[in-house]
């Protein structure tokens, strides 16, 4: 009788492990906003990459909490968009294998360059405003961190042509 109950108790454990595995392996973009700061965690089959609009120590701690909450001890890459120098460089370096940040001496992405890891890619679409294309598996996201990014992408040759199957993220409140 006791052995039967022990075996039955294993069913919920196996079910929760299976559900956690399925959640961990799906493709998604987790978006967190706090005041004017944004964190975008791209997830693909257990891998992760992060984009942050802020570069200070608080932003890095928030990025760490976000990645750890979703099961990522270390991300493939991080893109920090804030050009203002802070004393949080060491924190950002511990988050990922590669950190693209002006504070760390790496210039922003240039046209034609990509941050890339298996199933995750970020590409700059135009210089002004930093409009970007984020690929998460088969998903395509157009990222517009600033108002200038939207108009810049509309006028660029690599811009938002055929964006009907793309999802869109705005890092600003559009004006009416």
What kind of region is each of these model predictions?
Residues 1-176:
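Non-globular, low-confidence helical/coil segments that flank catalytic cores
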């Amino acid at each position: 009788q006791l052995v039967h109950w022990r075996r039955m108790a294993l069913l919920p454990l196996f079910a929760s492990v299976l559900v956690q595995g399925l959640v961990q392996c799906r493709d998604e973009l987790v978006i967190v906003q706090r005041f004017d700061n944004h964190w975008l965690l791209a997830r693909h089959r257990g891998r992760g990459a992060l984009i942050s609009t802020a570069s200070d120590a608080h932003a890095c701690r928030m990025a760490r909490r976000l990645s750890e909450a979703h099961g990522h001890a270390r991300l493939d890459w991080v893109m920090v968009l804030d050009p203002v120098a802070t004393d949080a460089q060491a924190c950002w370096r511990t988050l990922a294998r590669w950190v693209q940040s002006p504070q760390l001496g790496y210039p922003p992405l240039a046209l034609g360059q990509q941050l890339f890891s298996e199933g995750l890619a970020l590409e700059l679409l135009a210089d002004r405003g930093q409009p970007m294309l984020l690929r998460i598996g088969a998903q395509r996201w157009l990222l517009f961190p600033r108002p200038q990014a939207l108009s810049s992408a509309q006028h660029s040759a690599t811009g938002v042509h055929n964006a009907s199957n793309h999802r869109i993220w705005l890092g600003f409140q559009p004006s009416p």
